[in-house]
């Protein structure tokens, strides 16, 4: 949600921010609507005052046993006027709210202009692409040949975009999640949290998933939502709160199942585990004071990078351009892993600073020196477990189809150093 007071002060600047995302100007119309709303509220207050005065006068006349018919008629007229003004103010407010709810976050000045992912900027590359003496296979070729990645059974059970992992691959998935949690909790101070996988409308709206992304999520018959990411319950845990200043920063992490309908993804990544309806992800969320937001964004991104570095996965950090930055983000870094089997860079983490965009939607504040102020919220993947497993499989594959286990994962694998 946006600050209407700031918008009123400079609607042209607001429209310029929207233009960076390729959106049409709405600032002046919002200001005009807000002026109409304020005028209706002022007239409403005046009419309510007049009606209150008439009520006193009617009471006085009745005590004196005098005729009140004329004044009561005025009171009835005022009642109807008040109802009309209330309806007008509410109608305008709803119109303003509907527009504001539909508008994405304003981008940071440091976000480069651009229309899509081809115009994202490489910040740095870590590691070297492994050279193979054989033709590297894709993860699903490796997994199926080992008999440990079963798509037909998953399709029988649930349809497309699901997988059944067996044996050592199932254990590898679990090991990766545990390794991520251990890294983030012991080295970066995130508090491990177990969260519900079902949330209500308020949690989804507050974390900018509703109304825009309703089609991308699964809704149950009782109106709750399967979480598309643990960002939703972690961030929404401070919804409606006024936090003590000394409680910040709050850093939380959760390893959870995530559920996405993948609406609009028909024909994309149909083979393998890259794009699924259900997947495991280690999520990072920070709640901070506004002045600490930029440093926290860098810290969070480095935490995600640390996992990739320890695993020996070649990756690059990308600064997303205006046209590729998500709806709720002011600035986003993506981490893309090199997949030798695909011969392509693929997103494995996305770390975003939403500034106070989510906080305004959630009414999440802290006790600042001059009164309650909105917190800043940040979220990031630390990492997507399935995609990290894909990177491990393709990076550490051998010519015979076996897969070496990265050294840091071996304690989580009972000392196993190779699959296959």
Swiss-Prot record:
EC numbers, comma separated: 6.1.1.11
This protein's GO CC annotations: cytoplasm
A family per Pfam: Seryl_tRNA_N
Domain notes: Consists of two distinct domains, a catalytic core and a N-terminal extension that is involved in tRNA binding.
PROSITE patterns documented for this protein: AA_TRNA_LIGASE_II (PS50862)
Record: residues binding ATP: 260-262, 347-350
EC class: ligase
Keywords: Aminoacyl-tRNA synthetase, ATP-binding, Cytoplasm, Ligase, Nucleotide-binding, Protein biosynthesis
Signal peptide: none
Function description: Catalyzes the attachment of serine to tRNA(Ser). Is also able to aminoacylate tRNA(Sec) with serine, to form the misacylated tRNA L-seryl-tRNA(Sec), which will be further converted into selenocysteinyl-tRNA(Sec).
GO molecular-function terms, A-Z: ATP binding; serine-tRNA ligase activity
Protein name, per record: Serine--tRNA ligase
Catalytic function, reaction form: tRNA(Ser) + L-serine + ATP = L-seryl-tRNA(Ser) + AMP + diphosphate + H(+); tRNA(Sec) + L-serine + ATP = L-seryl-tRNA(Sec) + AMP + diphosphate + H(+)
Subunit structure of this chain's protein: Homodimer. The tRNA molecule binds across the dimer.
Keyword Protein biosynthesis: yes
InterPro entries xref list: aa-tRNA-synt_IIb, aa-tRNA-synth_II, aa-tRNA-synth_II/BPL/LPL, Ser-tRNA-ligase_type_1, Ser-tRNA-synth_1_N, SerRS_1_N_sf, SerRS_core, tRNA-bd_arm
BP-aspect Gene Ontology terms: selenocysteine biosynthetic process; seryl-tRNA aminoacylation
Protein's cellular compartments: Cytoplasm
Binding positions for L-serine per the UniProt entry: 229-231, 283, 381
Record pathway: Aminoacyl-tRNA biosynthesis; selenocysteinyl-tRNA(Sec) biosynthesis; L-seryl-tRNA(Sec) from L-serine and tRNA(Sec): step 1/1
The UniProt record lists the keyword Ligase: yes
Family: Belongs to the class-II aminoacyl-tRNA synthetase family. Type-1 seryl-tRNA synthetase subfamily.
